[in-house]
Design a protein with these regions (language model features):
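Residues lining hydrophobic/aromatic ligand-binding pockets adjacent to catalytic sites
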Residues: 1-223
C-alpha cells in the first residue's frame, strides 16, 4: 500500500481470501509521506484509514514511513498529522533522520499512543534503537530489521550471520513484552539474505516453535 491506496473492493477481497487469524500490516501511501510530506493530506489520509478499516479484525498496524530528507524543521507538519491521527487504529511512525529522536518527539508520540518504529537499518545506530525499545511510546511496538546490505540480490539463503543482532534484539523484545500488549516484527531480505530464516531464528530465540517451511503452501497473490 506504499505505492497506492488500494480500492475498497480490493481490501474486501483480501479479507475473503486470507485465513482466520491472518493480520495485515499496511503502509501509508508515499503520496502522503514522500510527496505531500504530511502537508495538506487530510483527504488522502482519511480515505486510506477508512479503507484500512475494511480489514476489520485482520487489520494490524499501519506504518508511516518518512524519508531521510524529512527533517526536524518540518515539525509543524508532523504535529498536524499526529493531531489528526485516528485513535482507533494502531499507527507507527518511522523516522530515518536521527534529529527526530528527541524527548519532545517521543513525548508527542506517547501523548497520542503512536509507536516509534524501531528500525535496525543504516539510518540510525542499532545501539540507539535498542535503547529506545525500553521506552515504548504506545501500547504496542513495531520493529523492522532492514539491514545495511542493499547489495544483496540473492534472497534464497542466509549470507550474513546475524546471530549477535538476533540475540540483542531478542533480549530487548523480552523486556519490551512486559510493557506492551503486542509486538509486530518484520524482517527484510537485506538483513541476512533470507528473511524467513531470520524469522525462524527469532522464534527459536524467543521460545516459540519455528514455522516448518515444508508445511507451508504456495504463497498467495493479493492482486
Amino acid at each position: 500500500t506504499f505505492y497506492a491506496s488500494p480500492a475498497a473492493t480490493t481490501i474486501r477481497s483480501w479479507v475473503e481470501r486470507t485465513p482466520k487469524g491472518f493480520i495485515f500490516s499496511l503502509k501509508l501511501p508515499q503520496e502522503i509521506t514522500h510527496e505531500q510530506r504530511l502537508r495538506d493530506s487530510t483527504g488522502a489520509s482519511e480515505t486510506f484509514f477508512e479503507r484500512a478499516r475494511e480489514l476489520g479484525g485482520k487489520l494490524g498496524p499501519i506504518l508511516v514511513q518518512m524519508g531521510p530528507d524529512f527533517q526536524p524543521g518540518e515539525l509543524p507538519a508532523l504535529v498536524d498529522f499526529i493531531g489528526r491521527a485516528p485513535s482507533d487504529l494502531r499507527i507507527a511512525i518511522e523516522f530515518r533522520h536521527r534529529g527526530w529522536i528527541t524527548d519532545g518527539v517521543l513525548a508527542l508520540l506517547s501523548e497520542h499512543n503512536l509507536a516509534l518504529a524501531l528500525v535496525d537499518g543504516r539510518w540510525i545506530p542499532r545501539k540507539l534503537m535498542l535503547s529506545l525499545a525500553a521506552r515504548p511510546t504506545a501500547d504496542f511496538a513495531y520493529i523492522r530489521w532492514m539491514g545495511p546490505n542493499r547489495d544483496l540480490v540473492d534472497y534464497s539463503r542466509v549470507q550474513v550471520d546475524r546471530s549477535r543482532e538476533v540475540d540483542a534484539w531478542s533480549d530487548a523484545i523480552e523486556e519490551l513484552s512486559e510493557k506492551v500488549s503486542h509486538i509486530y516484527g518484520y524482517v527484510a531480505n537485506h538483513f541476512s539474505g533470507h528473511s524467513p530464516s531470520t524469522a525462524r531464528d527469532f522464534q527459536s530465540r524467543l521460545g516459540q516453535t519455528p514455522v516448518d517451511p515444508d508445511l507451508l503452501g504456495e504463497q498467495m497473490s493479493l492482486f
